[in-house]
Swiss-Prot record:
Keyword Cytoplasm: yes
Organism for this UniProt entry: Cereibacter sphaeroides
Region (Disordered): 525-547
Biased composition (Gly residues): 533-547
Cell compartment(s), UniProt: Cytoplasm
Record's protein name: Chaperonin GroEL 1
Keyword field contains GTP-binding: no
Length: 547
C-alpha cells in the first residue's frame, strides 16, 4: 500500500479552498447574458469553446492532490445539478463557492462546524420553500421561449425553436438535439409513433420518388414470432382483400417463401401490403409491440397467449389513418386506439421510469412514453464551423433542459433575483445557538453571489446591484444584465425555472456544508521520480588497478 500524506485543520482547509476557487473562478465567468466563453484544449481535433458550466467543470483536474479534492467536490455540485435539472450548473457552482468561503472563515474564527452546517441546512430548506411558493406555472409558448432564450445565453432563435418543438409534440414529447451538416438550425417534427425499422423489401415502395411505402387507412397485423409461411393466414388475407384496405405486417421477421409471396401479391396488385421487423429486442420488443397494439387498437398475436395465426380474424388487427415507411423508419400516424387505454399504458410506463435505476432503461422508457403520448421533434443545430456547432449544441441542450424544468415546476424571476427574494424568508429565522445563526447568515450572504457575478460579468459593480435589488419591496424587481436596466424581470422576459434555482441551491448547500465540516484530508504521497538515465553499470571484476 502506497504511503499517504495527511493534512489537518487550517492547512487542509486552505488547500481545499484553493482548489474550490480555481474551479469556481473558471466556471463563473460564463454566468449571465454577458458571460464569457471558456476554451478547452482537446488532445485531438480543434479546441472546444463553451459557456456551459458543467462542461468547464468536468475538464478541471489539478496537480496538487489536496487542491484537487476541493475542486472535485465542487465539480460534484455541477454534475448533480446537471443530472437533476439539466441547467443551473454555473449558479450552483457560484453558490457553493460563496458558502464554502464564508463557512471556512467562520470555522477559522472558532465556530463549531457542525452547528454551522445545521444552520446552513435550516436556512436552505426555508429558502427552497420560498422558491417553491413563488413559482407560477408556465402559461404559454411565449414564456417557454423566454426560458429557453435566457438559458441559451440570450439567443432568442434557440428559445423560439424549443417553444415551437414543444408546442408540436406536447410537454411529454421527445425532443432530441443533433448536429446539422448545413449552416441553418432547423426543427423537424415526426408526429405519431416512429420506430427504427424500415421495409423488408424495396418492392413494397409506393412512392418511387421518395422511396417510401405510404399506406392510408391501413390494417396492422402484430405478430411476435417469425413468419416463414403465409399458409396459416390465407383466410385473414382474403378478408383484408375484400375490405379493400392495405395491410402492414409487423413481425420478428418475414422470411423466404412468406416474403416472396407478399412481394408477388403486391406486384400483381391484388393486395396493398408492406412488412417490417418489430422494433427492439427481447423483452423490450414484446413491450413495444404491446405499445403499438394499444396505439392502434389491435392485439399482439402471441403464442404465449395461445393465439394461432389461422384463428386470427380481421377485428384483431390494429388500424391507423396513415403509415409511412422508408428504408430506415416506420411512422404510424393517428392510430385507432382507445384514449383511456393509451393513458393507462403511459401511466404504467411512467411508474417503471420511477422505479428503474438504469439511465439507459430510463431513456428508453421515456422514448416509449413520448411515442405513445405525443411525438418526436429533432432540433438540428447548424453553424459555420464544427467548433461553433458544438458550442451552440451545448446551449441548445441547456435551454431544452431548462424549458422542461419550467414546465414541471413552474417559473420564478430570473437573473439571481429569486434567490435574493427567497432569502427574505430568513428574516426572523434563528437557530438553537449563535453558531447556527452564523450558518443562516452565511446562506443569506451567499444567495446574493449569483446576481453579483451576473452584474460583474456585464461590467457593473455587483455589490451596488445586489444592494439595490435587496432593498426593493417589489418581488419581481431586478437587474437586466443584457440591457443594464432595473425593473420588472417578468416584463423583461428574464425568468428561470423554479426547479433549476431550487436544485442549484440544494446541491450547493449540501456539498458546501460537507466541505466546511472537514478536519483532515488524506491523499497518496507522490512517487519519488527515478533519475532519467539508465541503471548504473556494475563494477567490472579485476579492473580496479587500471586507474
Amino acid at each position: 500500500m502506497a504511503a499517504k500524506d495527511v493534512k489537518f485543520d487550517t492547512d487542509a482547509r486552505d488547500r481545499m479552498l484553493r482548489g474550490v476557487n480555481i474551479l469556481a473562478d473558471a466556471v463563473k465567468v460564463t454566468l449571465g447574458p454577458k458571460g464569457r466563453n471558456v476554451v478547452i484544449d482537446k488532445s485531438f481535433g480543434a479546441p472546444r469553446i463553451t459557456k456551459d458550466g458543467v462542461s468547464v467543470a468536468k475538464e478541471i483536474e489539478l496537480s496538487d492532490k489536496f487542491e484537487n479534492m476541493g475542486a472535485q467536490m465542487v465539480k460534484e455540485v455541477a454534475s448533480r445539478t446537471n443530472d437533476e435539472a439539466g441547467d443551473g450548473t454555473t449558479t450552483a457552482t457560484v453558490l457553493a463557492q460563496a458558502i464554502i468561503k464564508e463557512g471556512l472563515k467562520a470555522v477559522a474564527a472558532g465556530m463549531n462546524p457542525m452547528d454551522l452546517k445545521r444552520g446552513i441546512d435550516l436556512a436552505t430548506s426555508k429558502v427552497v420553500e420560498a422558491i417553491k411558493a413563488a413559482a407560477r406555472p408556465v402559461n404559454d409558448s411565449h414564456e417557454v421561449a423566454q426560458v429557453g432564450t435566457i438559458s441559451a445565453n440570450g439567443e432568442a432563435q434557440i428559445g423560439r425553436f424549443i417553444a415551437d418543438a414543444m408546442q408540436k409534440v406536447g410537454n411529454e414529447g421527445v425532443i432530441t438535439v443533433e448536429e446539422n451538416k448545413g449552416l441553418e438550425t432547423e426543427v423537424e417534427v415526426v408526429e405519431g409513433m416512429q420506430f427504427d425499422r424500415g421495409y423488408l423489401s424495396p418492392y413494397f415502395v409506393t412512392n418511387a420518388d421518395k422511396m417510401t411505402a405510404e399506406l392510408d387507412d391501413v390494417y396492422i397485423l402484430l405478430h411476435e414470432k417469425k413468419l416463414s409461411s403465409l399458409q396459416p393466414m390465407v383466410p385473414l388475407l382474403e378478408a383484408v382483400i375484400q375490405s379493400q384496405k392495405p395491410l402492414l405486417i409487423i413481425a420478428e421477421d418475414v422470411e423466404g417463401e412468406a416474403l416472396a409471396t407478399l412481394v408477388v401479391n403486391k406486384l400483381r396488385g391484388g393486395l396493398k401490403i408492406a412488412a417490417v421487423k418489430a422494433p427492439g429486442f427481447g423483452d423490450r420488443r414484446k413491450a413495444m409491440l404491446q405499445d403499438i397494439a394499444i396505439l392502434t387498437g389491435g392485439q399482439v398475436i402471441s403464442e404465449d397467449l395461445g393465439m394461432k395465426l389461422e384463428n386470427v380474424t380481421i377485428d384483431m388487427l390494429g388500424r391507423a389513418k396513415k403509415i409511412s415507411i422508408n428504408k430506415d423508419n416506420t411512422t404510424i400516424v393517428d392510430g385507432n386506439g382507445d384514449k383511456a387505454e393509451i393513458d393507462a399504458r403511459v401511466a404504467q410506463i411512467r411508474n417503471q421510469i420511477e422505479e428503474t435505476s438504469s439511465d439507459y432503461d430510463r431513456e428508453k422508457l421515456q422514448e416509449r412514453v413520448a411515442k405513445l403520448a405525443g411525438g418526436v421533434a429533432v432540433i438540428r443545430v447548424g453553424g459555420m464551423t464544427e467548433v461553433e456547432v458544438k458550442e451552440r449544441k451545448d446551449r441548445v441542450d441547456d435551454a431544452l433542459n431548462a424549458t422542461r424544468a419550467a414546465v414541471q415546476e413552474g417559473i420564478v424571476v430570473g437573473g439571481g433575483v429569486a434567490l435574493i427574494q427567497g432569502g427574505k424568508a430568513l428574516d426572523g429565522l434563528t437557530g438553537e445557538n449563535p453558531d447556527q445563526n452564523a450558518g443562516i447568515t452565511i446562506v443569506r450572504r451567499a444567495l446574493e453571489a449569483p446576481l453579483r457575478q451576473i452584474a460583474q460579468n456585464a461590467g457593473v459593480d455587483g455589490s451596488v446591484v445586489a444592494g439595490k435589488v435587496r432593498e426593493s419591496n417589489e418581488k419581481s424587481f431586478g437587474f437586466n444584465a443584457q440591457t443594464e436596466e432595473y425593473g420588472d424581470m417578468f416584463k423583461f422576459g428574464v425568468i428561470d425555472p423554479a426547479k433549476v434555482v431550487r436544485t442549484a441551491l440544494e446541491d450547493a448547500a449540501s456539498v458546501a456544508s460537507l466541505l466546511i465540516t472537514t478536519e483532515a484530508m488524506i491523499a497518496d504521497k507522490p512517487e519519488p521520480k527515478s533519475p532519467a538515465g539508465g541503471p548504473g553499470m556494475g563494477g567490472m571484476g579485476g579492473m580496479d588497478g587500471m586507474m
